UniProtKB/Swiss-Prot annotation:
A double ring-shaped homohexamer of HslV is capped on each side by a ring-shaped HslU homohexamer. The assembly of the HslU/HslV complex is dependent on binding of ATP. It is found in: Cytoplasm. GO terms for biological process: protein unfolding; proteolysis involved in protein catabolic process. It comes from Pseudoalteromonas atlantica (strain T6c / ATCC BAA-1087). Residues 143-154 have a biased composition (Basic and acidic residues). This is ATP-dependent protease ATPase subunit HslU.
Amino acid sequence: MSEMTPREIVHELDRHIIGQKNAKRAVSVALRNRWRRMQLSGDLRQEVTPKNILMIGPTGVGKTEIARRLAKLANAPFIKVEATKFTEVGYVGKEVETIIRDLADIAVKMAKEQETKKVKYRAEEAAEERILDVLLPPAENQWGEKEQNEDKGTRQTFRKKLREGQLDDKEIEIDVALPQVGVEIMAPPGMEEMTNQLQGMFQNLSGSQKKKKKLKIKEAFKLLIEEEAARLVNQEDLKANAIESLEQNGIVFIDEIDKICKREGSNSGGDVSREGVQRDLLPLVEGSTVSTKHGMVKTDHILFIASGAFQMAKPSDLIPELQGRLPIRVELEALTAGDFIRILTEPNASLTEQYIALLKTEGVDVDFTQDGIERIAQAAWQVNERTENIGARRLHTVMERLMEEISFDASEKSGEQLTVDAKYVNDHLEMLVENEDLSRFIL
């Protein structure tokens, strides 16, 4: 779990996302409150529930990007889902409980990686001994029994060569565990739990079989480390720790929640199904127990962050019960031409940096001047204003169109230099930007 302060979280988000100060502050406080809650005594800790967040803002302003970056910072089980992927119980499609089941899989994977790191040194030692046993097999006595090889000097010599990588390309034959047979079972919606149980049963029937395999020592060492680490990790404890981490620190990000709103004045059957998805989400957000293949998961203390553009619907179109479960509202602002200039230059691995690096691989040096960047930003903003406003995503379209010619010819122009200034941008984009019909179809 992340121990970063809200200021540190905002600073980290600032490296990748321009503007949206309020949204960054809200998610940073929510993330820090997870840590604060864990410092409380047992009884009080159970009473402190997370304050779920609803992010409202037009498309392309950074809602999803905040979620992506938050996932890396959280160091906790995190899942991002699209609300439109789910259907009401009884309809064909995924049920909302699969969110928690998928999150449980993520939590177990994270716990496995953490536990494997703890035993990595012991696993490496055990794998090393197994390889040395293959390289220096113990001699057999007259009764066919294996005797311990007492020549420690030879073993140490081989150990030194092994650690220095001198034996990496030597082939050896080792016993490796066969991967468990994966059985794909197609089941109707709502039967995911039964499917998981059947798959587990078939995997157990296959057992842990081994077979001899000829591999280079470098590859064999990796396989043996994985085998030894799996043997050293207690699987039951691992699952228990994963579920504990999920229940106390889990975060669910639900994108496009506005698409499951019942629009005002609409009485279509599709809207009924959408409202059903909201009602199915309620128990999860409110706190319920979900059955997963790793065990029962309580959702009482999982943090839910929902986001939507709310262009066709309003937050008040959500069912009242769900509105009440999303107490913190954050509005993200539409991006201006000035924001576009910052997006092109300030973030880590900005768009201009990416194009410079990509064309550098062909030997072409690209230089973006300040007036060139300003003209690109202005062009993207103009197209957004005249057609559909898709936010910062418009920059990708404009940049791809602008760099199309040099990207195509780059392999034949190795050693050349290209300066992208205002004149270059005007020559390549002006007609498209000024002509609204062309903008609609090309940009």
